[in-house]
Curated annotation (Swiss-Prot):
One of its GO terms (biological process) is oxaloacetate metabolic process. Forms oxaloacetate, a four-carbon dicarboxylic acid source for the tricarboxylic acid cycle. Its cofactor is Mg(2+). InterPro entries: PEP_COase (IPR021135), PEP_COase_bac/pln-type (IPR022805), PEP_COase_Lys_AS (IPR018129), PEPCASE_His_AS (IPR033129), Pyrv/PenolPyrv_kinase-like_dom (IPR015813). It is an enzyme of class 4 (lyase). It comes from Shewanella oneidensis (strain ATCC 700550 / JCM 31522 / CIP 106686 / LMG 19005 / NCIMB 14063 / MR-1). Belongs to the PEPCase type 1 family. This is Phosphoenolpyruvate carboxylase. NCBIfam families: PRK00009.1. Keywords: Carbon dioxide fixation, Lyase, Magnesium.
């Protein structure tokens, strides 16, 4: 890398050297020399040295079984350490301005208050921002929690090293700690022995809050308050919470038979337990701080003139939190203890009201400096996390709800709900929703699958609304899908209005989304239920798998526009829930750009966005990184609300319509219509092997016997990222853009790229994917793993990749990809020589594994090394799915 990244390069080199010393200590000089030799050959190969490439391949294929695992581990861990160094560089004192952009909130406030936005309007919008980041488990999340914690400790050491006042002894101690941590990592098994359970995944999500977000949220709000006060002279409210957090971990049962009502109950208890435990730590610290005696009349009266009135209140809260933890421990262990709710923190006001009373007393008595310390941080944590820590969404497939009613209507002799048309379904559902008598007979014994759906609904009825988020209906397509869930909730005793959210996922469902919501809002009963609020989820993963990224992106954009128009006409506030993944092929990419590229009027101060597995770690895994991410989200939503992008010109729309039509045709022409595609996909990628890895709790397929259509979007992306072709993230796009150029529309495309955030974001995402794609490596996989009669398909795919790259370079008037984002380009270049050997080794291991028989199974060394190469490539690509 260039000199502008000197501090980053220094950290990468230092950590790499320590890793090398660790390997030398435990495996000897000869092993380390072989690793270094292969690394240097990989670099030479990257420069076009064919002899170096051949020599590297000879060394890799000749590795004895006992060296497979340590070799894969060596390159895997180097890539993880490089990732750490990059993460740290973005929050480092030595961060270069090309990497670390100025604070986005500070920049935005300057632009807004420079005559573009009324100050009062800006403050009102900021105070009411409603950004909900929904943490979701990731079926291909690679890193184990124990390693993530060690990586965080390494970052702490890197931060300590930046202190110029350290003595030589202190620097030696930090270096020793780094050596200890890297040795611990080297001797820790990187691959889980067993799949994580849904509860394990939920605990992983809670650990992110405890280790990072719990600290980051008040830090971010303090920073935001200072910025606003400096610009406007006004303070933000003490209970401001522009960003909150929800979760799908333990609530998402779509296609996951392991997420049961019992599991969801345990996760709800664990969420509340984690919150009580963290608030207890805070209250214990606050008892030590608030030792003063002076108080206002309200606090004096409340504490009977105690000489330590603040501690009097805090000690009571401390005991209530301890009792709450004991109660929740008993529940988690399977007991159902009888309790006096008044002795516990049972609702948010039990904690909020006493703390606000203390805050007001300190304020009234002139101790504002003290009030705005730890006490304010606790109040803001409470506003953000509540006493339930995360609001748990429930997600289930629309068909499962219909099956409940189908079984019930058959039992009642009414026919089969699944065989009724939409008009008949709606008439029945609305009649029963308005009927006070129960529909479900007390003596009915449903099947196990139906009972599970009903048990989940009963669980929802038992819990307070603040513990839960939305009930998301996957594969929704009709108004009856929503009404069915509402009826099931009614019949199971749910009295609080839960948000029931249709998720439109396929291309056809996205195109029909506005019509579906129009029909719903035309129903008087439903309008009354919504109380003027409607949430709709837009699916990115499955729509891209269904139609390709370009057609899916345009369908998502149009669906949002139409939904905004429908809800505006009905006088209903719309919240759009974006089901984005981490990868480009699943709607991922920089969140700031993504939000600013949404249709004008579609954000309006409110947004929900999924944050998945590996992206949670990259964005929120360190407190300072989390502060940056919270600032990016806040500034983007504020800007999209108050300074929305212009409406796209009609000629741009017409062009996108043509591009979408041509791209979906090109995409489906391969994925659906090419008879050899499935066979090629399964041979040229580790898709089959991925299904055997103990990575996530959810099965990789919806149906065991299905083809591409049954494969979940995440492993679909993951498999193609392993062989470096990255196909789902670009297939169809290049062909459509080339067709536009051939129509003489290159100038129009360049105007769109320059002036339309939606289109420019799509092009920049394509650039990033094209830069990561490695057709020569994909060809090597093909040569080693795919039958020669299928090679023609690989050649076609690589030609299409090359076509896409050329047309994007022409469109952007660039000689190289990512010319305008040198940091990203350098990052890709840094990793390639370390990922390449893992790819070549993975190919060899796949070939060995696929030759195994019951008489000659692949050795344990081969199987574990294969898993490590998959983990290493994922770390290097920073892209699982």
């Amino acid at each position: 890398m260039t000199d502008m990244y000197a501090s980053l390069r220094s950290n990468v080199s230092m950590l790499g050297q320590i890793l090398g010393d660790t390997m030398r200590t435990h495996l000897g000089d000869s092993f380390l020399e072989k690793v270094e030799q292969i690394r240097k050959l990989a670099k030479d190969s990257r420069r076009g040295d064919e002899a170096a490439r051949e020599q590297m391949l000879e060394l890799l294929t000749a590795l004895p079984d006992e060296e497979l695992v340590p070799f894969a581990k060596a390159f895997n861990q180097f890539l993880n350490l490089a990732n750490l160094s990059e993460q740290f560089h973005t929050i480092s004192r030595n961060c270069d301005e090309l990497v670390c952009v100025p604070d986005p909130v500070e920049q935005l406030l300057g632009r807004m208050l420079n005559g573009r936005v009324d100050q009062t309007k800006m403050l009102d919008c900021l105070k009411t921002l409603d950004i909900d980041l929904v943490l979701t488990a990731h079926p291909t999340e690679i890193s184990r929690r124990t390693l993530i914690q060690k990586y965080a400790a390494i970052v702490d050491c890197l931060a300590e090293q930046e202190n110029n006042q350290l003595s030589d002894r202190e620097r030696q101690q930090i270096n020793l700690r780094l050596r200890q941590l890297i040795a611990q990592i080297w001797h820790t098994n990187e691959i889980r022995r067993e799949r994580p359970t849904p509860v394990d995944e939920a605990r992983w999500g809670l650990s992110t809050i405890e280790e990072s977000l719990w600290h980051a949220v008040p830090d971010f709000l303090r920073q935001l308050n200072d910025q606003v006060q400096e610009r406007t002279g006004q303070q933000l409210p003490i209970d401001i919470a522009p960003v909150r957090f929800s979760s799908w971990m333990g609530g998402d049962r779509d296609g996951n038979p392991f997420v049961t009502a019992k599991v969801t109950q345990e996760v709800l208890d664990r969420n509340r337990h984690a919150a009580a435990r963290l608030f207890l730590k805070d209250i214990v610290l606050l008892v030590g701080e608030l030792s003063m005696e002076e108080a206002n009349d309200e606090l004096k009266a409340y504490t009977n003139n105690s000489c330590e009135p603040y501690r009097f209140v805090l000690r009571s809260l401390r005991q209530k939190l301890r009792d709450t933890i004991d109660y929740l421990n008993a529940r988690i262990e399977g007991h159902n203890p009888e309790v006096d709710k008044s002795t516990l923190i049972w609702q948010e006001s039990d904690l909020k009201a006493p703390l606000e009373m203390l805050y007001k007393s300190l304020y009234d008595c002139g101790m504002r400096l003290i009030a705005n310390g730890l006490l304010l941080d606790i109040l803001r944590r409470l506003a953000c996390f509540g006493i339930h820590m995360l609001r748990l969404d429930i997600r289930q497939d629309a068909g499962r709800h219909c099956d409940v009613l189908a079984e019930l209507t058959r039992y009642l002799g009414m026919g089969d709900f699944n065989h009724w048309d939409e008009t008949e379904k709606q008439a029945f559902l609305l009649r029963e929703l308005s009927n006070r008598r129960p529909l479900i007979p007390s003596n009915w014994q449903p099947s196990a699958d139906v009972a599970e759906v009903l048990n989940t609904c009963r669980l929802i009825a038992k819990h307070p609304a603040k513990a839960l988020g939305s009930y998301v209906i996957s594969m929704a397509s009709k108004p009856s899908d929503v009404l069915t869930v509402l009826l099931l909730l009614k019949e199971t005793g749910c009295t609080h209005p839960m948000r029931v959210v249709p998720l439109f996922e396929t291309l056809s469902d996205l195109n029909n989304a506005a019509a579906c919501i129009t029909d719903l809002l035309d129903i008087d009963w439903y309008r009354g239920y919504t109380k003027g609020m409607q949430e709709v989820m837009i699916g990115y993963s499955d729509s891209a798998k269904d139609a390709g990224v370009m057609a899916a992106a345009w369908a998502q954009y149009r669906a949002q526009e139409q939904l905004v128009a429908v809800c505006n006409q009905a006088g209903v506030k719309l919240t759009l829930f974006h089901g984005r993944g981490g990868s480009i092929g699943r709607g991922g990419g920089p969140a700031h750009k993504a939000i600013l590229s949404q249709p004008p009027g579609s954000v309006d101060g409110r947004i929900r966005v999924t944050e998945q597995g590996e992206m949670i770690r990259f964005k929120f895994g360190l407190p300072k990184l989390a502060v940056q991410s919270l600032a990016l989200y806040t500034s983007a939503v504020l800007e999209a609300t108050l300074l929305p992008p212009p409406e796209p010109k009609q000629e741009w729309r017409n062009c996108m319509e043509r591009i979408a039509e041509e791209s979906v045709s090109a995409y489906r022409g391969i994925v659906r219509e090419e008879p050899d595609f499935v066979a090629y996909f399964r041979a040229a990628t580790p898709e089959v092997e991925l299904g055997k890895l103990p990575l996530g709790s959810r099965p990789a397929k919806r149906r065991v016997d299905g083809g591409i259509e049954s494969l979940r979007a995440i492993p679909w992306i993951f498999a193609w990222s392993q062989n470096r072709l990255m196909l789902p993230a670009w297939l169809g796009a290049g062909e459509a853009l080339q067709a536009a150029c051939q129509r003489g529309e290159i100038g129009l495309l360049q105007d769109m790229e320059r002036e339309w955030p939606f289109f420019s974001t799509r092009i920049s995402m394509l650039e990033m994917v094209y830069a990561k794609a490695e057709p020569n490596l994909a060809r090597y996989y093909e040569t080693c793993l795919v039958s020669t009669n299928l090679h023609h398909l690989g050649e076609t795919l690589r030609q299409r990749l090359d076509l896409g790259i050329k047309v994007v370079l022409e469109l952007t008037k660039s000689d190289t990809l990512m010319a305008h984002t040198p940091w990203n380009r350098e990052s890709v270049k840094l990793r390639n020589p370390y990922i390449d050997p893992l790819n070549f080794l993975q190919t060899e291991l796949l070939a060995r594994t696929r030759k195994e028989t019951s008489e000659t199974p692949a050795s344990e060394h081969v199987q574990l090394a294969l898993m490590l190469t998959i983990a290493g490539v994922a770390a290097g690509m920073r892209n699982t799915g």
